[in-house]
Curated annotation (Swiss-Prot):
Binds to the 60S ribosomal subunit and prevents its association with the 40S ribosomal subunit to form the 80S initiation complex in the cytoplasm. Is also involved in ribosome biogenesis. Associates with pre-60S subunits in the nucleus and is involved in its nuclear export. It comes from Talaromyces stipitatus (strain ATCC 10500 / CBS 375.48 / QM 6759 / NRRL 1006). This is Eukaryotic translation initiation factor 6. Its main location: cytoplasm. It comes from the Eukaryota. It is found in: Cytoplasm; Nucleus, Nucleolus.
Length: 247
């Protein structure tokens, strides 16, 4: 399902929230209806954590995570880190990352299997991403932009990239990620798809300005209409056991 929301007067949902298949993080404060959109779709399925990072509300731009792990910048206080640990499932590894490019959500785009990262991230950061998130890591650009996390939205089912991404680049990225990609926009033509929306395997939340056409592209590429969260959890478990049986 794809739904629209606004954080106060901002349509940049991906700036104020992080969404994965095992938890969601939503900025503290903000309007109740922003939080209630997440609650309506996610309650009883995954925990929703109200948080700040380094005393700011731009949690979606400062963190990067997936079902297995969560990376936060060194500006995260001990208290904030403890709050995240208390709110998020114990199976999720949480790690502070010492990195000059500290807006991790802008420089890392990942799902549960692969991460595309800013070409200039430290080698040590790359190793932490691979270890904590349990993913293969590739240094990449999206439409010649180094901010992979800003210009791409990705789930385990598919992805949307910057509208000016060439067909050749789309094909190359798609074969790295092993999921279908489309070039598209959010919030009535914004190319900053990663900051404009959040998505997991059954839900996308995007800004109020997002058009019906943009929504239908999301529902199609992320395959959001196909099954609900509970069905999807089963699907993932089955998929993993099938994959394991190959080895």
């Amino acid at each position: 399902m794809a739904v629209r929301a606004q954080f106060e007067n901002s349509n940049e949902v991906g700036v104020f929230a992080t969404l994965t298949n095992s938890y969601a993080i939503v900025a503290i404060g903000g309007s109740e209806n922003f939080y209630s959109v997440f609650e309506a779709e996610l309650q009883d399925v995954i925990p929703i954590c109200h948080a700040s990072i380094g005393g700011t509300r731009i949690v979606g731009r400062l963190t990067a995570g997936n079902r297995k792990g969560l990376l936060v910048p060194t500006s995260t206080t001990d208290q904030e880190l403890q709050h995240l640990r208390n709110s998020i499932p114990d199976s999720v590894k949480i790690q502070r990352v010492e990195e000059r490019l500290s807006a991790l959500g802008n420089v890392i785009c990942c799902n549960d299997h692969v991460a595309l990262i800013h070409p200039d991230l430290e080698r040590e950061t790359e190793e932490i991403i691979a270890d904590v998130l349990g993913v293969e890591v590739f240094r990449q650009t999206v439409a010649d932009n180094v901010l992979t996390g800003s210009y791409m939205a990705l789930s385990n089912q598919g992805g949307i990239v910057h509208p000016k991404t060439s067909i050749r680049d789309q094909d190359e990225l798609s074969s790295l990620l092993q999921v279908p990609l489309v070039a598209g926009s959010v919030n009535r033509g914004s190319p900053v798809v990663g900051a404009g929306m959040v998505v997991n395997d059954w839900l996308a939340v995007t800004g109020l300005d997002t058009t019906a056409t943009e929504l239908s592209v999301m529902e199609s590429v992320f395959r959001l209409g196909e099954m609900g969260a509970k069905g999807l959890g089963m699907g993932n478990a089955n998929k993993e056991s099938i994959v394991e049986s190959f080895y």
